[in-house]
Amino acid sequence: MFKILRKERLAPGINLFEIESPRIAKHAKPGQFVMIRLHEKGERIPLTIADVDISKGSITIVAQEVGKTTRELGTYEAGDYILDVLGPLGKPSHIDYFGTVVMIGGGVGVAEIYPVAKAMKEKGNYVISILGFRTKDLVFWEDKLRSVSDEVIVTTNDGSYGMKGFTTHALQKLIEEGRKIDLVHAVGPAIMMKAVAELTKPYGIKTVASLNPIMVDGTGMCGACRVTVGGEVKFACVDGPEFDAHLVDWDQLMNRLAYYRDLEKISLEKWERERRMV
């Protein structure tokens, strides 16, 4: 059992949980994730480790309420317990000195780029962070990213805050200004990461994407998270989650992400009905 030490509502439908787990906190590296299961009847879902506090023996995860499990997680409060937290899993991000690194986070992906941006900055890189949100009310962790970045650009789809448009518009502007970019690291919706990859490829800019396919066990046994990278089948949980964005078969990934959408909807509706009956 893993105790929730702190819960914070970052934005509508987006929750931060600080979870007591000294072992994971001690061994976690930027880019890695955990598999959580709320209770014995719950499913396992992957969540990226957004921060660690070794002195407190805690890890921080940020989850958006999009399905049954994340909605149920959203009802948990500080003092509650999560049955299973397995990790750290996945290969850590490749942290090195590259020069100018552009970190791109879309939605909850903003939380996921934080530890990587921090590590890249500590390596001496010039870090530009692009944070993308649908609207002003969903903006979070801007100050936190500013603390580990040399520049921060916030975009909103509707123009209610920061630059109007998508993260790719901000990246395109940097490229058009002639900024030398040595690495782009993107985390967010698959459609966003695909757009980033398509934008950087003609310029030969090395681009890494952290993939978020369906996962069941997180150890490479089930094969649910398989993705095609450079024509080869990879398991995101053990071979990734980060891959060369120019080699990912994005259309296949997005098709697989939509495969269980109807079942996920049924599961959520069932949970909501049962919750109303309590």
UniProtKB/Swiss-Prot annotation:
Primary residence: cytoplasm
Q: Describe the temperature dependence.
A: Optimum temperature is 80 degrees Celsius. Has a half-life of 12 h at 95 degrees Celsius. Activity increases by 50% after incubation for several hours at 82 degrees Celsius.
Keywords for this protein: 2Fe-2S, Cytoplasm, FAD, Flavoprotein, Iron, Iron-sulfur, Metal-binding, NADP, Oxidoreductase
Q: Which residues form the propeptide?
A: 1-4
* Signal peptide positions (record): none
The EC number of this protein is 1.8.1.19, 1.18.1.2
User: What reaction(s) does this enzyme catalyze?
Assistant: n sulfur + hydrogen sulfide + NADP(+) = (n+1) sulfur + NADPH; 2 reduced [2Fe-2S]-[ferredoxin] + NADP(+) + H(+) = 2 oxidized [2Fe-2S]-[ferredoxin] + NADPH
Output the PROSITE patterns linked to this UniProt entry.
FAD_FR
Q: Which cofactor does it need?
A: FAD; [2Fe-2S] cluster
Q: How does activity depend on pH?
A: Optimum pH is 8.0 (for polysulfide as substrate) and 10.3 (for benzyl viologen as substrate).
GO MF entry, a single one: metal ion binding
Q: Enzyme group, top EC level?
A: oxidoreductase
Kindly list the GO CC terms recorded for this protein.
Answer: cytoplasm
Q: Where in the cell is it found?
A: Cytoplasm
Per UniProt, [2Fe-2S] cluster binds at: C222, C225, C237
Boundaries of each FAD-binding FR-type domain copy? 1-95
A Gene Ontology biological process in which this protein takes part is: pyrimidine nucleotide biosynthetic process
Q: How are cofactors bound according to the entry's free-text note?
A: Binds 1 FAD per subunit.
Q: What does this protein do?
A: A bifunctional enzyme that catalyzes the reduction of elemental sulfur or polysulfide to hydrogen sulfide with NADPH as electron donor. Also functions as a reduced ferredoxin:NADP oxidoreductase with a very high affinity for reduced ferredoxin. Exhibits a broad specificity for various physiological and non-physiological substrates with varied reduction potentials such as methyl viologen, benzyl viologen, FAD, FMN, methylene blue, 2,6-dichlorophenolindophenol (DCIP), cytochrome C and ferricyanide with highest preference for benzyl viologen.
SUBUNIT field: Heterodimer of alpha and beta subunits.
The name on file for this protein is Sulfide dehydrogenase subunit beta
Its source organism is Pyrococcus furiosus (strain ATCC 43587 / DSM 3638 / JCM 8422 / Vc1)
Gene this chain is encoded by: sudB
